[in-house]
C-alpha cells in the first residue's frame, strides 16, 4: 500500500453527454438523469439520458465506421493494437482520477479501485492489444483439387451493456476484445455508474480511434438497453448483469435479427472447505470471496460448505474476521467497507437478511443497516444455514456470509451442483486427488483450488447453466468477437 496515492479532492465531472462519432451529443429527447454518491445519497451530477433515438444514431455511426473501405476496416491489425496500447497508457495517466471517480460513483474502496480495478483494466487492454495482429485462420487439406482456408473476421457492430458493480473493469472487458478483433461498438453503461465510461470516451478520441468505432450511450435498461438488444442493425450483444435481464436480452436478440449473444450473469457459487484444508487460508479467501466490494460480485462465494469436524472453529474465525470491518466513506483510508450501490439493492439485501432470521439461520453478527445516511449494511454472518433457505438459494449481492455444514464428499458435490447457476466454485483441501475429483464434478465455469476470486486477462471467464453463455478474457474471449469464414478455391492441381 506504500505506492497508493491520496484520492483527488473536489473532483470535477467533465463529461456528462452522449459520445457518438467522437463527438459529444445532447440526448434527442432532451432528458437528463441524476447520478448519486451511494455513500451520501447526494447527487453528483446530471447525465444526458439516451434512449432508442440515441441508440439509432450510435448504430448508424458504428455501421459507417465498419463499412468496407473505412479507415477502421483498412487499418493494419498492428495499428489497431497500437491504438489499444495508447488507450491503456492514457488510462494509466488518468489512473488516480478514474479511481477517485469509481470510488465516488460506485462506492468502491479507493485502494481496490486504484490497485485492482484500474490495474486490471490497464493489463487487460495491453493483453488485448497484443492479440490484434495474431488473430489467424488456418489452411485445411480438403479432398479434391481445392485450396481451402479460414478467415477470422470481426462480427461487426456490437452492443455492449455494462453493469454497475465493476463499471470500468467490465467496460474494458467488453471493448478490449471487440476492438482487438476489428469490431465497432455501442456501449451502454449502467445508469447508476456512467462516469468512468464517459471519461474513457474522451480518451478513445485522444488515443486516435476513428470516429464511430466506439460510441457510449448512457441511459436506462428498459429504454437504451432494450433498444440495443432488439436493434436490427446490431450484429452482437454482450451483457453482464442479472440472469433475469439476461433472459430478456437473449429473447430480444432472437426476436429481432438473431444477433450473437454473450451473457455473463448471476451466480450462487459454492465454496467447499474440507477438514484437511489450511484453515487460516480458507477462512481468509472465503471471507474475501463474499465480502469483497460489499458482496457485490457475481462470483461471490455465497454458499459456503464447511466439513462438520471443523465447522464450529471455522464459524468462530469467520465471525471474528467480519467484526473487524470499519464502514464509511470509501475514499477514507481507514475504511474497509463502503456502501451498497443504491436503495433498491439495499432494501433487497435487508429483506434477504430478515428471511434468514425468520427461516431459522443463526445470526452470528451484523444483520442490519449501518449509519444514518448512505446505503450501508453491517457485515453479516449466518451459521446453521440449510439448503432450502432463501439466503442459500437466491443471489444476495451484499455483505452476507452463510455457512453450511457437510459430512461427505458425495453429499457436498450434489448440494453444490443443486442450483440453476454455474459461474464459479472454490475448493480448499491439501489432498490433490480430492481437489481434482471435486473440480471435475462441479458444474461451474471457473473452479479455484485453495484460492478464490483470482481473475486474469489471460484466463477465460464465464458460466455454466443460467450463469451465462460464452466466455470473456483470454483467447476464448476473443473468439466471441469473430466469425469464421471458409474460403474454398478451385485449383488445377493439388500438391501436398
UniProtKB/Swiss-Prot annotation:
Active site: 264 (proton acceptor), 298 (nucleophile)
Modified residues (N6-acetyllysine): 86, 123, 247, 348, 362, 405, 414, 430, 490
GO cellular component, as recorded: axon; cytosol; synapse
Subcellular location: Cytoplasm, Cytosol; Cell projection, Axon
Chain segments annotated as coiled-coil in the UniProt record: none
Description of post-translational modifications: The N-terminus is blocked most probably by acetylation.
SUPFAM superfamilies: ALDH-like
Site residues, Transition state stabilizer: 165
Keyword check for Oxidoreductase: yes
Record bears the keyword Cytoplasm: yes
Organism domain of life: Eukaryota
Residues that bind NAD(+): 162-165, 188-191, 221-222, 241-242, 264-266, 344-348, 395-397
Key words, A-Z: Acetylation, Cell projection, Cytoplasm, Lipid metabolism, NAD, Oxidoreductase, Phosphoprotein
One of the record's GO molecular function terms: aminobutyraldehyde dehydrogenase (NAD+) activity
Cited Pfam families: Aldedh
Principal location: cytoplasm
Chain positions with Phosphoserine modification: 408
Region (Mediates interaction with PRMT3): 331-496
Gene Ontology biological process terms from the UniProt entry: cellular detoxification of aldehyde; fructosamine catabolic process; gamma-aminobutyric acid biosynthetic process; maintenance of lens transparency; retinoid metabolic process; retinol metabolic process
Pathway: Cofactor metabolism; retinol metabolism
Enzyme class: oxidoreductase
Reaction it catalyzes: an aldehyde + NAD(+) + H2O = a carboxylate + NADH + 2 H(+); all-trans-retinal + NAD(+) + H2O = all-trans-retinoate + NADH + 2 H(+); 9-cis-retinal + NAD(+) + H2O = 9-cis-retinoate + NADH + 2 H(+); 11-cis-retinal + NAD(+) + H2O = 11-cis-retinoate + NADH + 2 H(+)
Similarity section: Belongs to the aldehyde dehydrogenase family.
Quaternary structure annotation from Swiss-Prot or TrEMBL: Homotetramer. Interacts with PRMT3; the interaction is direct, inhibits ALDH1A1 aldehyde dehydrogenase activity and is independent of the methyltransferase activity of PRMT3.
Entry function: Cytosolic dehydrogenase that catalyzes the irreversible oxidation of a wide range of aldehydes to their corresponding carboxylic acid. Functions downstream of retinol dehydrogenases and catalyzes the oxidation of retinaldehyde into retinoic acid, the second step in the oxidation of retinol/vitamin A into retinoic acid. This pathway is crucial to control the levels of retinol and retinoic acid, two important molecules which excess can be teratogenic and cytotoxic.
Descriptive protein name: Aldehyde dehydrogenase 1A1
Gene that this polypeptide is encoded by: ALDH1A1
